Amino acid sequence: MQTSFDVIVIGGGHAGCEAAAAAARLGATTALVTHRFATVGAMSCNPAIGGLGKGHLVREVDALDGLMGRVADQGGIQFRMLNRRKGPAVRGPRAQADRKLYAAAMQALILATPHLSVVEAEADDLLTSDGRITGIRLADGRELGAGAVVITTGTFLRGLIHLGERSWPAGRIDEAPALGLSKSFERLGFALGRLKTGTPPRLDGRSIDWGAVEMQPGDEPPEPFSVLTEKITNPQIECGITRTTPATHAVIRANVHRSPMYSGQIQSSGPRYCPSIEDKIVRFGDRDGHQIFLEPEGLDDPTVYPNGISTSLPEEVQRAILATIPGLQRTTMLRPGYAIEYDHVDPRELEPTLQAKRLRGLFLAGQINGTTGYEEAAAQGLVAGLNAALLASGGGEIAFDRADGYLGVMIDDLVTRGITEPYRMFTSRAEYRLTLRADNADQRLTGQGIALGCVGAERTEFHTAKMAALAQAKALAQSLAITPSQAAKHGLSLNRDGVRRSAFELLAYPEVDWARVEAIWPELAAIEPSIATHLEIDATYDVYLKRQTADVEGFRRDEGLLLTEIDYALVPGLSNEARGRLEKARPRTVGQAGRLDGLTPAALGILAAYLRRDQRRKPAGSAAG
């Protein structure tokens, strides 16, 4: 067995798979260390990928030739574009997935990735020398050497499951936790915290009264996540929707003292935007009902995931709750819901590359950084894997900022502000939403990926052809123009100012769509429908994008003012409070400093002025020595 690698990735979940594949795509010899290969790509919680904000992350992972989008397309059994009635900037692609198909597709891609080996073992300790990681020790005593290590342990770090009054160590139901690595982190001086998440009971779909619930079909035709997926081929299913009732709430109120969250058994924070059903009833007791989505877990699997009733109440209470919900009164519970507590590292311990500040060569991704969700984990895994491979080869680093994509927004939020509860991605977290759309993720990021070397030949060829087609289509649409009087003959009412307007400009008008401009200029019919859709969106946002481009330029100027070597004691005019916050956080740039809690605009102005003054004092060429 090989005992030395460029990169070792610990954990075979969504972060680990992306990290291992990304490192291997850059040519790094990579080991994916996991308890059992059979659990690689497992969907531990809900059987779905994407959603609002999250779908953007999946598209961005795909744009950098990651796995999740293609795997979701191969495993997807219902596709929906959320927020379809709203603008493209806040739409979110989402898919229900067949758990078995999803895991099988992920495992097949992992096995087919050159330079990537799978090691079935438990990682027990980190090996270090002179402030740098050198490898890992397995539970059986074997040692594996590496130039960089990525840890993606999910909920396994000292995982503790809670079900009613009972609790036991586990990383997932029926799977052992990782205890040794938590001790390694503590020995190395990392600040560890505890978080919790939960999952609902699983139901036998054959015992659900589907006639008593509302049915929700997917989109037709289904829209894939990956630009490389030509067509979704799986049969598509419907989901069900039901609601809790006042009787449900009465059962929960009568038993809430038996919930580990309210008995004092669980002290850690859970996800605010995905609360347990008992938390919903306590916090929103005035509502007459809460929605529950009944999500089938597979095409040949009767298991149904009731999204919306995550709980850790005792098993018999869970059965009593189900008996009060329309359509579920006679359902069979296959497995009770439960809560799980686990260790996480304060993400402010990390650089924007996801490398640990206190230990060179160690990268962290996923729930260990305080996030929740498959998509958040996958995006972090990809960034950590790329940087681990770059470090191992001596090839620099890649950091995505808030203007690059949602993955940059998420990582900046984590490493700058830290977390007090599990972090979830939303479109509202991004300042540059009009630029960072799910539909243009490849236009924003694939070029960077090609330059970096992490994008394969198939995607490179596809991207090059697409960008050329887009440029050609835009040039044609901008070259075709009419006067207001000519437009009136086609039923368009424009200002009678004598100004000619191009087809591209007309698409920005609310009453003008592609069909209308195509009717005026039949030559536009030659443009491929997918390219026409991109062009229509670009035209709609064109005037706003010009304004946002100016905002991004200002942001990038602040990001270009580096603070990495500054001595804050030498900066005149800074308050002691500002000095203390800056010393503790050690932000990399003035832009990042501005996103720290409690730092005033005045302090930022002092910093920026000091840096510019300092740069003017330095003689030319001083940076080179």
Swiss-Prot record:
One of its GO terms (cellular component) is cytosol. Its cofactor is FAD. Keywords: Cytoplasm, FAD, Flavoprotein, NAD, tRNA processing. SUPFAM superfamilies: FAD/NAD(P)-binding domain. It is found in: Cytoplasm. PROSITE patterns: GIDA_1, GIDA_2. NAD(+) binds at residues 270-284. Pfam families: GIDA, GIDA_C_1st, SAM_GIDA_C. One of its GO terms (biological process) is tRNA methylation. InterPro entries: FAD/NAD-bd_sf (IPR036188), GIDA_C_N (IPR049312), MnmG (IPR004416), MnmG-rel (IPR002218), MnmG-rel_CS (IPR020595), MnmG_C (IPR026904), MnmG_C_subdom (IPR047001), MnmG_C_subdom_sf (IPR044920). FAD binds at residues 11-16. GO terms for molecular function: flavin adenine dinucleotide binding. Belongs to the MnmG family. Homodimer. Heterotetramer of two MnmE and two MnmG subunits. NAD-binding protein involved in the addition of a carboxymethylaminomethyl (cmnm) group at the wobble position (U34) of certain tRNAs, forming tRNA-cmnm(5)s(2)U34. HAMAP family: MnmG_GidA (MF_00129). PANTHER family: GLUCOSE INHIBITED DIVISION PROTEIN A, PROTEIN MTO1 HOMOLOG, MITOCHONDRIAL. This is tRNA uridine 5-carboxymethylaminomethyl modification enzyme MnmG. It comes from Rhodopseudomonas palustris (strain BisB18).
